[in-house]
Amino acid sequence: SDYMINKMIISDEVEPVDYDSMEYIGNIGDKYWEMSKSFDKDLKYTVPYFWGTVGILYNTEMMDYVPDSWNALWDEKYKNNIIMQNSVRDSFIPALILNNNSINTTDEGELRAALKKLQDQKELVQSYLVDEIRDDMANDQAAMGLIYSGEASLAREYNENLEYVVPKEGSDIWVDSWAIPKGGKNYEGAVKFLDFLCRDDVAMTNFEYVYYSTPNEAVLSQIDEEDKAGDNAIFPDDDIIERCEIFNYLGVEAEELYNRLWKELKVY
């Protein structure tokens, strides 16, 4: 994913992709290449595969308002009905944004202020989970949870009372991309495989199976506008994209700082 690929590029662990030899690379839309510049600034090393946002999945039968602000995750009315991500950078998103800080900050003061906010929230949190958030929300185990958009869409297939929202203050938008490891034994085969994944019928099959947002315009052109309008998790409006930020790789020192603060939260 985005910032890890950025780390691999900085560490010289990936090969440039021979886009000129790829027949179907043109299926990837321009705006997804623009997103990719945040971690592959020269657009040399990656091929976008899926993308999405981080937001709040909520149960309309358990909540009496739409949680369109990150402040909802601090609402004492829903004590023990809130699920957070068991992931340092994801869980810091709401706290940093509510403090008017970037989700890519490396400032220790800003991060400690966000930690304090998360510590204040902790008594309200039912659990810190990852993939299980989708299942718990689908089974009415909590009123709301911090979740990836694709997981939210899957949960909604099993529970008609679930809705997804990207809070008005903004959030993280992420791009999962392919890259070719340096020193691989079959570079030409790797490029052909990436091209195969960009082919419209293959990309459609993968989209229908994974059901995360696709950057493949040939796939998007085959989806009814009504279907797009009915799933804001998979097909977010441009205004949602514009208020989101992509994670950057922050370096070893910042990574260690985030992890130390995360440990402080877990033992608080």
Language-model region placement:
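Mature extracytoplasmic/periplasmic domains
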Residues: 181-242
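Conserved C-terminal helix/tail region of periplasmic/extracytoplasmic solute-binding proteins
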Residues: 238-268
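Short beta-strand->loop
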Residues: 15-26, 46-47, 160-172, 181-184
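Periplasmic-binding protein-like
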Residues: 111-120, 126, 158-182, 228
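Extracytoplasmic ligand-binding site segments that recognize negatively charged/polar headgroups
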Residues: 1-141
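A bilobed periplasmic-binding-protein/Venus flytrap-type ligand-binding module shared by bacterial periplasmic
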Residues: 55-62, 96-100, 174-186, 197, ...
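Alpha-helix capping/helix-boundary segments
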Residues: 4, 133, 151-152, 202
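A ligand-binding cleft/hinge motif common to bilobed small-molecule-binding domains
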Residues: 5-7, 144-161
